[in-house]
Regions:
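Soluble non-cytosolic domains of exported or imported proteins
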Residues: 10, 14-24, 96-103, 136, ...
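Beta-strand elements within well-structured catalytic alpha/beta cores of enzymes
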Residues: 20, 27, 44-49, 82, ...
Length: 271
């Protein structure tokens, strides 16, 4: 993080706090400009983040009450604040506990701009400019929910991928099923495949403490084995979309596996 000179040591609490102070100032300037242009009432404002805080660089990194941090698939790595202002659509002061992903903003914004069917159009082929795109969007259109036309948001599930594109967990409503867990911080975390998926009810255990701290956890989870069946079906349906809509490019990776794969598939030059 590179701060403006006037913000260095501004708060006395380190780089993260100084950065937040500068960010607050920048956001204020943007909102003020919208007012000056008299377009604030016709502008959707979203304030969110791409990942959880980076605990291992504290006090320069952020903080969170949730387990884990950036780069892990515990809640501390995946949950982020989400604030939205949409005059005459979202009622001020509304608090929403529904699941939402940043992937959902694209179809929502396009619906607000007049195209609520873009997701369906893209699956059959949609021309934009001089190109035709045929892709599968994982996002949902939240426009009807924001307008009060639906009691609940359209997203019931979310998939937890780590920074090496490994699918580690699935959440459906309150239930989180972990297939792999990451122990340690983003720099040293070890990915551990589990012999039996780990079940967490995030309403009962939002900080994911019970599997490692409660002596009654295994007795409790014995009554929750039914969750494995719907979880398997949902993951299977999601993976099946890759048959018709394969990824357009390989994911980035910090592991040696992708490097070895590249070495094995790259033709020798003979030099």
């Amino acid at each position: 993080t590179r701060l403006g000179p006037k913000w260095e040591n501004k708060t006395g609490y380190g780089l993260a706090a100084d950065g937040m102070a500068e960010l607050d100032d920048v956001v204020g300037k943007v909102l003020k400009k919208l007012d000056e242009l008299k377009i604030a009432d016709n502008t959707i404002i979203v304030f969110t983040s791409d990942n959880g805080p980076e605990i291992f660089t504290w006090p320069d990194g952020g903080n969170t009450p949730f387990k884990g941090e950036k780069g892990t698939t515990w809640e501390g790595g995946m949950r982020v604040p989400g604030l939205a202002r949409w005059p005459r659509v979202i009622k001020p002061g509304t608090v929403v506990n529904d699941i939402m992903s940043n992937e959902d903003w694209l179809p929502t914004f396009l619906a607000a701009a007049g195209d609520p069917d873009v997701k369906a159009k893209l699956t059959s082929g949609m021309k934009a400019g001089d190109r035709t795109f045929r892709v599968h969007l994982d996002g949902y259109n939240f426009m009807p929910f924001f307008k009060g036309e639906q009691a609940e948001g359209p997203r019931q599930e979310i998939f937890y991928f780590d920074d090496n594109a490994s699918l580690n967990a699935l959440r459906v409503n309150d239930w989180k099923i972990q297939f792999k867990i990451m122990e340690g911080n983003i720099a040293s975390a070890l990915l551990k495949p589990l012999n039996m998926p780990q079940v967490i009810n995030l309403r009962q255990d939002p900080f994911e403490r019970f599997p490692s701290e409660s002596q009654m956890y295994f007795r409790w989870v014995g009554d929750k084995l039914w969750t494995f069946v719907p979880a398997q079906a949902i993951v299977g349906q999601f993976i099946a979309t890759f048959n018709e809509f394969p990824p357009s490019q390989k994911s980035g990776s910090c592991s040696v596996d992708q490097v070895l794969d590249q070495l094995q598939t790259t033709p020798a030059t003979g030099k």
